[in-house]
Amino acid sequence: MGAQKTIAYLAIIAIAVIFAQVNTAPPVGHYAANNTNKSHNLVVGYRMPGDRLVLRQSVIKNSSWGRIVVEERTFNVSSWERITMIQALDQKTNGNGAYASITNGGPGNQNVTIRLKSQRGHGINFVIEIYSRY
Protein backbone atom coordinates (compact mmCIF):
# COMPACT_ATOMS: atom_id res chain seq x y z
CA MET A 1 0.00 0.00 0.00
CA GLY A 2 2.85 2.39 0.79
CA ALA A 3 4.52 1.75 -2.57
CA GLN A 4 1.30 2.59 -4.44
CA LYS A 5 0.98 5.91 -2.62
CA THR A 6 4.61 6.74 -3.42
CA ILE A 7 4.12 5.95 -7.13
CA ALA A 8 0.91 8.00 -7.27
CA TYR A 9 2.66 10.89 -5.48
CA LEU A 10 5.60 10.79 -7.94
CA ALA A 11 3.21 10.66 -10.92
CA ILE A 12 1.38 13.77 -9.65
CA ILE A 13 4.68 15.62 -9.16
CA ALA A 14 5.87 14.61 -12.66
CA ILE A 15 2.64 15.91 -14.23
CA ALA A 16 2.91 19.16 -12.26
CA VAL A 17 6.50 19.67 -13.43
CA ILE A 18 5.53 19.03 -17.07
CA PHE A 19 2.68 21.55 -16.92
CA ALA A 20 4.91 24.11 -15.22
CA GLN A 21 7.48 23.80 -18.01
CA VAL A 22 4.86 24.01 -20.76
CA ASN A 23 3.20 27.07 -19.24
CA THR A 24 6.45 28.98 -18.72
CA ALA A 25 7.71 28.46 -22.28
CA PRO A 26 7.52 31.59 -24.43
CA PRO A 27 4.79 31.51 -27.05
CA VAL A 28 5.79 30.28 -30.49
CA GLY A 29 6.35 33.15 -32.90
CA HIS A 30 6.79 35.71 -30.14
CA TYR A 31 8.85 37.91 -32.47
CA ALA A 32 6.17 37.72 -35.15
CA ALA A 33 3.51 38.60 -32.58
CA ASN A 34 5.38 41.81 -31.71
CA ASN A 35 3.34 44.31 -33.72
CA THR A 36 5.48 47.38 -33.08
CA ASN A 37 7.15 47.32 -36.52
CA LYS A 38 4.98 46.48 -39.52
CA SER A 39 7.40 47.59 -42.24
CA HIS A 40 7.43 45.92 -45.64
CA ASN A 41 11.19 45.51 -46.04
CA LEU A 42 12.70 43.56 -48.93
CA VAL A 43 16.10 41.92 -48.42
CA VAL A 44 17.54 39.79 -51.22
CA GLY A 45 20.98 38.18 -51.25
CA TYR A 46 23.55 38.12 -48.48
CA ARG A 47 26.71 39.94 -47.47
CA MET A 48 30.14 38.41 -47.09
CA PRO A 49 33.45 39.84 -45.91
CA GLY A 50 34.76 42.15 -48.61
CA ASP A 51 31.35 43.44 -49.72
CA ARG A 52 30.84 47.17 -49.65
CA LEU A 53 27.91 49.53 -49.65
CA VAL A 54 27.90 51.12 -53.11
CA LEU A 55 24.54 52.87 -53.01
CA ARG A 56 22.19 54.24 -50.37
CA GLN A 57 19.34 56.26 -51.77
CA SER A 58 16.00 57.48 -50.44
CA VAL A 59 12.94 57.03 -52.62
CA ILE A 60 10.08 59.26 -51.54
CA LYS A 61 6.84 59.81 -53.44
CA ASN A 62 3.88 61.70 -52.03
CA SER A 63 0.50 60.06 -51.69
CA SER A 64 -2.32 60.68 -54.10
CA TRP A 65 -5.81 60.68 -52.60
CA GLY A 66 -7.52 57.34 -53.23
CA ARG A 67 -4.82 56.17 -55.62
CA ILE A 68 -1.96 53.70 -55.66
CA VAL A 69 1.45 55.26 -56.32
CA VAL A 70 4.00 53.20 -58.28
CA GLU A 71 7.69 54.04 -58.69
CA GLU A 72 10.17 51.92 -60.62
CA ARG A 73 13.89 52.63 -60.43
CA THR A 74 16.94 50.96 -61.93
CA PHE A 75 20.24 51.00 -60.05
CA ASN A 76 23.61 50.11 -61.60
CA VAL A 77 27.02 49.22 -60.20
CA SER A 78 30.30 49.54 -62.09
CA SER A 79 31.12 47.05 -64.83
CA TRP A 80 33.68 45.12 -62.75
CA GLU A 81 31.39 44.66 -59.74
CA ARG A 82 28.50 42.30 -58.98
CA ILE A 83 25.59 42.98 -56.65
CA THR A 84 25.59 40.72 -53.59
CA MET A 85 22.72 42.09 -51.50
CA ILE A 86 19.81 44.49 -51.94
CA GLN A 87 17.85 46.03 -49.09
CA ALA A 88 14.70 48.05 -49.67
CA LEU A 89 13.90 49.36 -46.20
CA ASP A 90 10.38 50.67 -45.61
CA GLN A 91 10.52 53.77 -43.43
CA LYS A 92 6.85 53.55 -42.44
CA THR A 93 6.58 51.25 -39.42
CA ASN A 94 2.80 51.37 -38.94
CA GLY A 95 1.86 48.97 -41.75
CA ASN A 96 0.86 51.69 -44.23
CA GLY A 97 4.10 51.48 -46.20
CA ALA A 98 4.59 50.44 -49.78
CA TYR A 99 5.65 47.04 -51.09
CA ALA A 100 8.95 46.48 -52.90
CA SER A 101 9.72 43.88 -55.54
CA ILE A 102 12.56 43.20 -57.94
CA THR A 103 11.48 43.18 -61.57
CA ASN A 104 14.87 42.79 -63.25
CA GLY A 105 18.47 41.99 -62.31
CA GLY A 106 19.49 41.52 -58.70
CA PRO A 107 22.24 39.65 -56.86
CA GLY A 108 24.89 38.33 -59.25
CA ASN A 109 24.11 41.06 -61.80
CA GLN A 110 25.37 44.58 -62.40
CA ASN A 111 21.95 46.18 -62.13
CA VAL A 112 18.64 45.83 -60.38
CA THR A 113 15.22 47.27 -61.10
CA ILE A 114 13.04 47.74 -58.03
CA ARG A 115 9.31 48.40 -58.21
CA LEU A 116 7.72 50.19 -55.25
CA LYS A 117 3.93 50.07 -55.01
CA SER A 118 2.09 52.00 -52.32
CA GLN A 119 -1.11 51.10 -50.59
CA ARG A 120 -4.16 53.01 -51.73
CA GLY A 121 -4.09 56.58 -50.44
CA HIS A 122 -0.53 56.32 -49.07
CA GLY A 123 2.87 57.35 -50.38
CA ILE A 124 6.26 55.69 -50.74
CA ASN A 125 9.15 56.19 -48.31
CA PHE A 126 12.00 53.70 -48.76
CA VAL A 127 15.76 53.62 -48.33
CA ILE A 128 17.47 51.47 -50.95
CA GLU A 129 20.86 49.96 -50.07
CA ILE A 130 22.94 47.98 -52.56
CA TYR A 131 26.05 46.01 -51.62
CA SER A 132 28.54 44.66 -54.15
CA ARG A 133 31.98 43.14 -54.50
CA TYR A 134 34.71 43.03 -57.14
From Swiss-Prot:
It is found in: Secreted. One of its GO terms (cellular component) is extracellular region. Residues 1-24 form the signal peptide. It comes from the Eukaryota. The keyword Signal applies. Keywords: Secreted, Signal. InterPro entries: MBF2 (IPR031734). Transmembrane segments: none annotated. This is Probable salivary secreted peptide.
